Amino acid sequence: MSFRAVITSSEHQAVWSRLILTLSTINQDIKFTIMSNELILWSMNSTDTTMYQVRLKASFFSEFSFDPGNIVFGEEGLQVIEDLQKQQHTLYSFVINGRHLSILSRKPEYDNIKEFSLSIDNSTAAPEAIINRLHIRVYTESLITKEFSPAFNPVKYDPIVIDLKYKKKFLDVYGTEESVNGEQADPRLLDFFRQVRKQLEEAKFNEGIIDAPRPAELRSEHEINFLSMDSLIWRNAIDLCTNNTEELKLDLTMNKMVITAFTKGVQNMKSSDVLKQAISISNSVSTEDVEHYCLFTTSGNPGMSKKDADSKQAVFKLRDFRNFFSANQAWKENATVNCWFCSPGDPILFEIDRGHVKLSLVQITDTAGKAVGAAPDLAIHPVLVSPRKPVSPLRAACTNTNAASNALHGVQLDAANMDAIKTLFVQDVEIGVSAAAMAHSPANRCTDENLRSMCSISQQGQHSCDGSPATNLRRVSRAGTTIAWGAGKDHVMCPDSDYGVAQDVNQLKRRKVGELAHASQSPESQDYGLGPTQQYQPKGIFD
């Protein structure tokens, strides 16, 4: 077998199905590139303005094996590359119909997939009927096996390394800054710099990129802007968009970020009729709610104000970005979306790293707002790095809320404050002489204990058995809410004022004690409720 990959996890099967469906919306054809430790899927639209790429590590699959030496037929897709560490890597690439593959990868309607496998057999022992075909085997929980063999065409892999170029430029501009204007940079951002540098070193197509020298002086052509924030913010902005909106505009400043979904209006010049109505929907977010942001600001252009120089904008198609973001919905947890963009008209890069899966989207931005005829020598301001934040803004807000709730729920009171609170049940007072004599009888001793346990539920957490205050006390709570009322310790009413209420409670107690004592007597003297003319114990058929 030249290649084999197996998916047994139901969650990974759902992710695979969603990824194939998203790739097929960009283009009908999907390109596969198989390596020893990962599988690359990517597609590009017909106008070459949008590219969507997915990198699946070998750990994403339950079983992953690749033997390029066993490939004899379809050798057009084989190629050997060498990285900067002089290590050789063998690749195998092919193109397959994405529409057919998305249908075959779909989950059955009334059944669950137990095992989903992909395999290629282009060895010398393979029959001619299965050469250059991707064998798909679906084994369901109902013990049904489905096998499909769509054909593919072997091709050479032509990598598009826009992501590596942007990350290298990102490190050249911002990666050497440990502090900005005397303020220590965010340690999480510095850790992100190290992660990006490691990705560049481990990339297989980094020749001519990572070894490029850093520019001695930054100019306007070195502009690169970076934005990192939680996917929940993007999802809220997309949910506000209607089906009529076509484009998305990102406007980022030091204090605010505005995401605007809009549609340009079209008007007939002759009849002045509106052919397409203009639509605009904006969503404003403070930069305190984003993970990181780095802005590249310039000055020196007389035709540009300071506000325009500090504002960074990017306009791109909403439809492709929505399809890209829909693949992220295959996971239940939110993720961090990293974004790199340069001047208007240059590509914008979105990246989501899920550990075993990395999603990337590259789109060409609109040239609207690009300065024409700008001065070549512009003064570069100090790099504006996001302020120092020890934890994620959204996660910090959730943590503080939970901590405050737990602190309120688990608050402890001392004995003095606990006595000053009126609990749900009235405190016990001294029982009368007759009730005390009744309680000392042997027949009522156990029933009195049961009665006290039923009538003194609220006192169990406040007093011990002998009536002394307990040492370790906690307020009785239910679902995070304490049932208590009344004044503080200094304003507690005198117990004598509640004497009338205590008398009524004592009468109820005495009545209950009497009923329990009567019930504990001998069976001959008990009332079985058979009526005045009936015998207490009816005779049996053998009496």
From Swiss-Prot:
Role of this protein = Component of the checkpoint clamp complex involved in the surveillance mechanism that allows the DNA repair pathways to act to restore the integrity of the DNA prior to DNA synthesis or separation of the replicated chromosomes.
Q: Which GO terms describe its cellular component?
A: checkpoint clamp complex; cytoplasm
Q: Spell out the molecular function terms from Gene Ontology.
A: DNA binding; protein kinase activator activity
Family note: Belongs to the DDC1 family.
UniProt lineage: Eukaryota, Fungi, Dikarya, Ascomycota, Saccharomycotina
Annotated organism of origin:
Eremothecium gossypii (strain ATCC 10895 / CBS 109.51 / FGSC 9923 / NRRL Y-1056) (Yeast)
Query: What PANTHER family does the record point to?
Result: CELL CYCLE CHECKPOINT CONTROL PROTEIN, DNA REPAIR PROTEIN RAD9
- Chief subcellular location: cytoplasm
Subunit: Component of the checkpoint clamp complex composed of DDC1, MEC3 and RAD17.
Record keywords, A-Z: Cytoplasm, DNA damage, DNA repair, DNA-binding, Nucleus
Q: Which gene encodes it?
A: DDC1
GO biological process terms held by the UniProt record:
cellular response to ionizing radiation; DNA repair; DNA replication checkpoint signaling; meiotic recombination checkpoint signaling; mitotic G1 DNA damage checkpoint signaling; mitotic G2 DNA damage checkpoint signaling; mitotic intra-S DNA damage checkpoint signaling; recombinational repair
Q: Where in the cell is it found?
A: Cytoplasm; Nucleus
Q: What name appears for this protein in its UniProt entry?
A: DNA damage checkpoint protein 1
InterPro entries xrefs: Ddc1, DNA_clamp_sf, Rad9/Ddc1
Q: Where is this region: Disordered?
A: 512-543
